[in-house]
């Protein structure tokens, strides 16, 4: 059973917290993480790329010259793909890149991502972050005290003071337990769980 230290925003130890082993001590399988990350990234693709075919391109309605008698190769349109300025053959058309991943697999991948951060000792539990006012410098001070670089901070709810103070800091991303994703966990080198967010994360994945 994983027992982690709980720190305050000045990185002073305030206690300990036991994490659910079925969420934070799962064997990591890279192929599962890879599958889910690919699915999440594919789902974000717009897929709006489109080229004009010979049926949609402008012009090319009239036959360039008569079929027989000129000595030239027969041609029906100056927008044929073999002509300069002609249409494109088999070019990209709008499509949906998303593919289905079973709910059990998605949940398992999230557990694996959390487990990998704990195993690497890149998971920190912080009692809470209290800022006196909306100022980036206050959040920079907290991030410096906690030793945060590229970090994902999971907060129980989106506190405006915290969100507005952190949004201009490169590398710091805020999320709620409901928004947590495998891609975001793996994208950030550090994972910071506010103490109030630990139980909702565990409840979501049990």
Swiss-Prot record:
Q: Does the keyword Ribosomal protein apply?
A: yes
Which InterPro entries does the annotation name? Ribosomal_uL4, Ribosomal_uL4-like, Ribosomal_uL4_dom_sf
Gene symbol? rplD
Report one GO cellular component.
ribonucleoprotein complex
* Xref: PANTHER family: 50S RIBOSOMAL PROTEIN L4, LARGE RIBOSOMAL SUBUNIT PROTEIN UL4M
| Stated family | Belongs to the universal ribosomal protein uL4 family.
Give the protein's recorded name. Answer: Large ribosomal subunit protein uL4
Note the subunit structure: Part of the 50S ribosomal subunit.
Q: Name one GO biological process term.
A: translation
Organism of derivation: Oleidesulfovibrio alaskensis (strain ATCC BAA-1058 / DSM 17464 / G20) (Desulfovibrio alaskensis)
The keyword Transport appears for this protein: no
Q: Which cysteines are joined by disulfide bonds?
A: none
In this record, what's one Pfam family? Ribosomal_L4
């Amino acid at each position: 059973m994983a027992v982690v230290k709980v720190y305050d925003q000045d990185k002073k130890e305030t206690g300990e917290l036991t994490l659910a082993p079925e969420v934070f001590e799962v064997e990591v399988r890279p192929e599962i993480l890879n599958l889910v990350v690919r699915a999440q990234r594919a789902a974000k693709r717009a897929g709006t790329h489109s080229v004009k075919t010979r049926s949609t391109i402008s012009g090319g309605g009239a036959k360039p010259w008569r079929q027989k008698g000129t000595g030239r190769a027969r041609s029906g349109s100056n927008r044929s793909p073999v002509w300069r300025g002609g249409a494109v053959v088999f070019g990209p058309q709008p499509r949906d890149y998303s593919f289905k991943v079973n709910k059990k697999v998605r949940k398992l991948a999230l557990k694996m991502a959390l487990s990998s951060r704990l195993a690497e000792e890149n998971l920190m539990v912080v009692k809470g972050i209290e800022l006196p006012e909306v100022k980036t410098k206050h959040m920079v001070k907290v991030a410096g005290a906690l030793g945060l670089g590229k970090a994902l901070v999971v907060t129980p709810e989106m506190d405006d003071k915290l969100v507005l103070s952190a949004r201009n800091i490169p590398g710091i991303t805020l999320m709620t337990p409901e928004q947590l994703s495998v891609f975001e966990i793996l994208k950030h080198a550090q994972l910071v769980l506010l103490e109030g967010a630990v139980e909702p994360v565990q409840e979501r994945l049990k």
